[in-house]
Each structure stands twice: as C-alpha cells, then as structure tokens.
Amino acid sequence: MKFSQATILAIFASSALVSAAPANIVSEQTMVKREDVNAIVELINEIKHINQKRDLAEGEDLLELQRRADSVIGELVSALYNSGVIGLVWDKLTTDPSISSSLSNIIKSAIQGAIVQGGALIQAVWNSGLLGDVFNKLINDTDLRQALLDVGKALFNSAANLISIWLGGSSSSSSAAPAAAAAPATNGASKREIMEAAEYLSERDLASILSWIVQTIKDTGIVQSLVNQVINNPDTVISFLTSALKNGLVIVEDLYDWAKQSGLWDQALVYIQNNAGSWIKALAGLFGNALSNGTITASDINNAGSSSKPTGTTTASTATAAPKAATPAAASAAAPKAATSGSSSGSSSNNADLNALINKYGGGSGSTSTPTVDTSGLSSDVNTLVNAAGQAASSLKKRKLY
C-alpha cells in the first residue's frame, strides 16, 4: 500500500516543521503502518472540511455539522490509539507551551470532577515513574495514611512477609516474558527492505507526519474537544495522563490535591489492593523504605486493616511474588519452636516472624562460610525486624560473592 494523496500532501506541508521538532520524538523502534497513518490524515482533513462548512452554516445545519465533528473526533481518537502513535502525539502536545495552560486546566477539571477514575489515575502515576512521590504524600497525609497502611496489610499480611519480599522475594514480573524480547529472524534482510515489505513508515516520514498532525490539531481548534473525548475514554486517558505527568505538564503536588478533593485516592488504593500483582516488588520497596527510615513501624502494618481483606487476585499475586512468606502459616513452619508454643501473646507471634526471617536469610549454621544475623539484644517487639532486615540484606550481598 502506498501513501494516499492526502498523506503525501501532509508530509510536504510538514517538512518545514520537522527541523523544529525534538530529534528524539520518534525512535528507530517505532513502527507505524502507512495505512493507519492514511486513516488519521483523512480524518483530520475531514474535520478541516467540516470546520469550513460550519463557518457558513446556521440553525439545524450547524447543529448537524457539530454532531458530525464530534463523531469524527471520536474516530480520530480511536485511529490514533489503534495506530500506536497516540503517546507520541500526547508527548508533543503536552510539551507545547502555547497550549500547556489550557491542557492543565482541562486535566484539573477532570480530576476535581472525578471524571477520571482512580484506577486510571494510579496507572498513569505508575507509568510516569511517580508512584514513589505519591506514596510519600499518602503516608504523610493524616487523612489517608491509615487507608494506605490497610492496603499494605492486605497485600503483605504482616511486616515479616513485607520485609521478606522487599529483601529477597522474587518478582512475579521478572520472568514473565523473557522470550518476547527476541525479535523475529530477518534472514539478513535490511531494515529498509523490512519496512517496505511490511508497509511501515520510515522514521523520517513518521516524524514529518506527527508534526503535521499536531500542528493541524492545534490550527483546527479541536485540542479541547480531542482531550475531553480522551479523558472520557478509559482506554486512552491513561496514555494522556502519563504524558502529562512524565513531561511535567502537571506536577505531583497539584495532582495530589486535586485527586484528594474528589476522593480519587481512595479509589486508587482499592485498585492497588486488587491489581497489585506486577507492582508487588515496587510496593514492598516503598513500604520497606518507610519502615527503615522510621516513617512507619512494623506494628503499623501488623495492626492495620482489620476490615481490609485481600481479594482472591491480591492473595494469588502476593503468593506468586513470595511463595515462602505468603502466609503466617508458612512463617510458623519455618520456625517450629515458636509455632509449637501454646501462648497466643504478641511476643510469641513476633518471635515467630523474626525466626522466619533468620531461617530465610541465614543465622542457623555455625559454618564460617554461612553469613549470619546477629540477634543478640533484640527485644520481642516486631519493630526490631527492621534492624534485622538491614543485617539480612548485608548478608545476602555477601552470600552472592561465593
């Protein structure tokens, strides 16, 4: 398939814009089909045509043209999404200073009005690498701190399990798709031959088209309509918010305040509790760091969330991430002396947790080659697990040298 005439004209029209575009906006790995770009260009040209007719219309004709424009914009959103270029378009729009204020206001209204759902918001936060910033705000917010601790209890069940995953638990995503990284064999064909045979755009042509798409979206005045449709679409809003956060269009402080006003963080925490499988290692790290710096205590985790119960999905994910420390029963099995005690006091439970860590990370053998954990002087308070965890981490590093 060759370029449509509209696409060819778009490439020529955008040639002057390419030199001004960021050089790294399109990578060599970005593969987009010509037919998908043809569809995008044709939809944008249809919007331009509708706008021209709308300038001369009135009454019912004007309303019909407006309805048609809204429909075509919706089709454009789908075409951008399905082609795989929507993230690139958002990156260019969210870094454009001429529309940054307008976009920021749209996002603010959508979050304050709870048009965006908490699950979509927290996914965008995760994708943009800002989960740690949001976690720190939640854990230091007296209104939401306990809700976050309840999620920690639901995910990890105890401070001992949390520390176990933090220090040495294998991530469920670490071996999820190792084979997928291998590209299909090309039998020695050049990149140009592959691209021509598969009808994919070259890097240069794609950069030209993207510049034209973004400039035309701005010139036709559909930025607000486009973004509003995206925000109302759960399939596309995550990509848009990710770009807005990653590129600094919206800062964490503002986002946090807006979402708190509309109750979105409560929704986000529910989403985390029910869908944290691939995040479990990162979450263990955030909670673990909070334990180590004294922001929270092990008792905060152990005593949290009597009403928060892990769902089946959460339990399975946690078990996958750290099968040896998934349940209190597993910890008891690792420390028979503590488990067989008839006492139900907090001291017995804490000792069982501590012994589980010692058995997991060393300390039972007298061999000089086996790293040990010094537990002398430790009280029965489970908060001392944090100190033991630090020693365990050091022991793990030494063990890997042998």
Curated annotation (Swiss-Prot):
<protein>
    <recommendedName>
        <fullName>Opaque-phase-specific protein OP4</fullName>
    </recommendedName>
</protein>
<feature type="region of interest" description="Disordered">
    <location>
        <begin position="302"/>
        <end position="322"/>
    </location>
</feature>
<keyword id="KW-0325">Glycoprotein</keyword>
<feature type="glycosylation site" description="N-linked (GlcNAc...) asparagine">
    <location>
        <position position="293"/>
    </location>
</feature>
<keyword id="KW-0732">Signal</keyword>
<feature type="compositionally biased region" description="Low complexity">
    <location>
        <begin position="304"/>
        <end position="322"/>
    </location>
</feature>
<feature type="signal peptide">
    <location>
        <begin position="1"/>
        <end position="20"/>
    </location>
</feature>
<feature type="glycosylation site" description="N-linked (GlcNAc...) asparagine">
    <location>
        <position position="140"/>
    </location>
</feature>
